[in-house]
């Protein structure tokens, strides 16, 4: 990640899981999943939850924080195939590690760099854009690139799970 991903390597906050994708011993790709962003208008509107619901259930949303297919790997449809496999693997592995089942994956695609084609091909849902203010904004000014927001439901009734008033 440090060498080939445009964001480099940074430790992920909170709960996290990383995958290395290999074929017959050859490294093809790497993915990192971690804690979801606290407040994203496009995602929050799509889910339809209240601030209180978000505060108690945000842990059920997992962020695909990094995805890198190594630059010399050229296999048609590989990226979307990996995303599909990774979603199933996260759904299986996350409860083993953290004791709860995530219901949605999220990711953010920098619009000026990428079209999000592999996410679209893997059936992720484009739900809007970020404002470009970043997670540490205190002055309500754009200081990071605007990104497309994509979600991938892991549970058929993810909205019901995330917005229910009872226990999950």
Name every feature range the model reports, one short phrase each.
Residues 158-168:
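Flexible, glycine-/basic-rich loop-and-beta segments that form/coincide
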Residues 2-158:
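Acyl-donor binding region in acyl/amide transferases
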């Amino acid at each position: 990640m440090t060498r080939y991903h445009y964001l480099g390597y940074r430790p992920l906050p909170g709960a996290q899981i990383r995958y290395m994708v290999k074929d017959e011993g050859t490294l093809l790709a790497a993915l990192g999943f971690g804690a979801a962003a606290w407040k994203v208008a496009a995602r929050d509107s799509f889910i339809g939850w209240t601030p209180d619901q978000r505060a108690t259930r945000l842990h059920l949303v997992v962020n695909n924080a990094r995805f890198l297919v190594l630059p010399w790997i050229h296999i048609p449809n590989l990226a979307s195939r990996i995303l599909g496999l990774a979603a199933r693997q996260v759904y299986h592995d996350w409860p083993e590690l953290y004791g709860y089942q995530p219901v949605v994956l999220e990711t953010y695609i920098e619009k000026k760099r990428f079209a999000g084609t592999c996410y679209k091909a893997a059936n992720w849902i484009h739900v809007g854009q970020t404002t470009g203010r970043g997670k540490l904004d205190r002055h309500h000014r754009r200081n990071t690139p605007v990104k497309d927001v994509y979600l991938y439901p892991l549970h058929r009734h993810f909205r019901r799970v995330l917005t229910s008033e009872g226990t999950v």
